[in-house]
């Protein structure tokens, strides 16, 4: 009787195991291309990240996935098609926190120039 009770207890009570974050994964992708992200569950000790790949001063690539917290503050260099690309990482600790769309190249500059263009067109400058 005791073995049956123990068996029923083990079967009926769910085992709670620590779960990792759910993040989006995109392989290295060109900024002018799109990625169909795949949902992935990170190991418990990892965070979600979005990486910005730069060639010189220009953002040219991005990627998303999971990485160890200790690696979030490190930049990495990778040779891609003969070009030395420097990746910097932005990590976050919530489910799907790396799902925000990437900024379009030059988007911030465009936002800064729009008010000046509007004033110029209105003859205020």
Swiss-Prot record:
Protein function: Oocyte-expressed fertilization factor that mediates sperm-egg binding and is essential for sperm entry into the egg. Necessary and sufficient to mediate species-specific gamete recognition and fertilization, which is essential for vertebrate species performing external fertilization. External fertilization cannot guarantee that only conspecific sperm reaches the egg by precopulatory mate choice: proteins such as Bouncer can therefore support the selection of conspecific sperm.
Note in the entry: Was named bouncer (bncr) in reference to the colloquial name of a security guard at a bar.
Record annotation: effect of changing residue 84 to A: Glycosylation-defective mutant. Does not affect ability to promote fertilization and mediate sperm-egg binding
GO biological process per UniProt: fusion of sperm to egg plasma membrane involved in single fertilization; single fertilization; sperm-egg recognition
Phylogenetic lineage: Eukaryota, Metazoa, Chordata, Craniata, Vertebrata
Domain of life: Eukaryota
Signal peptide start and end residues: 1-18
Disruption phenotype: Females are almost sterile: only 7 of 3024 eggs derived from mutant females develop into cleavage-stage embryos, as opposed to the majority of eggs from wild-type. Both male and female fishes develop normally and are overtly healthy. Males are fertile.
Keyword annotations of the record: Cell membrane, Disulfide bond, Fertilization, Glycoprotein, GPI-anchor, Lipoprotein, Membrane, Signal
Protein name, UniProt field: Protein Bouncer
Lipid positions (GPI-anchor amidated asparagine): 98
Subunit comment: Interacts with spermatocyte complex composed of izumo1, spaca6 and tmem81.
Membrane disposition: Lipid-anchor; GPI-anchor
Gene3D superfamilies with a match to the protein in the record: CD59
Residue pairs linked by disulfide bridges in the UniProt entry: 23-48, 26-35, 42-66, 72-91, 92-97
Propeptide boundaries: 99-125
Major localization class: membrane
Disulfide bond keyword on record: yes
Keyword Cell membrane: yes
Residue ranges of domain UPAR/Ly6 in the record: 23-98
Record: glycosylation sites: 32, 84
Reported modifications of this chain: N-glycosylated.
Subcellular location: Cell membrane
Tissue-specific expression: Highly expressed in oocytes. Not expressed in testis.
Family in the record: Belongs to the SPACA4/bouncer family.
GO CC terms, sorted: membrane; plasma membrane; side of membrane
């Amino acid at each position: 009787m005791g073995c049956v009770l123990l068996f029923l207890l083990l079967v009926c009570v769910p085992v709670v195991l620590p779960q990792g974050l759910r993040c989006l994964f995109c392989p290295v992708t060109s900024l002018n291309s799109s990625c169909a992200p795949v949902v992935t569950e990170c190991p418990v000790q990892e965070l979600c990240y979005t990486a910005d790949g730069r060639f010189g001063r220009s953002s040219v690539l991005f990627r998303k996935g999971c990485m160890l917290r200790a690696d979030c503050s490190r930049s990495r260099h990778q040779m891609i098609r003969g070009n030395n690309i420097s990746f910097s990482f932005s990590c976050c600790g919530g489910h799907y926190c790396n799902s925000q769309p990437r900024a379009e190249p030059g988007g911030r500059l465009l936002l800064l120039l729009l008010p000046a263009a509007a004033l110029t067109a209105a003859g205020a400058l």
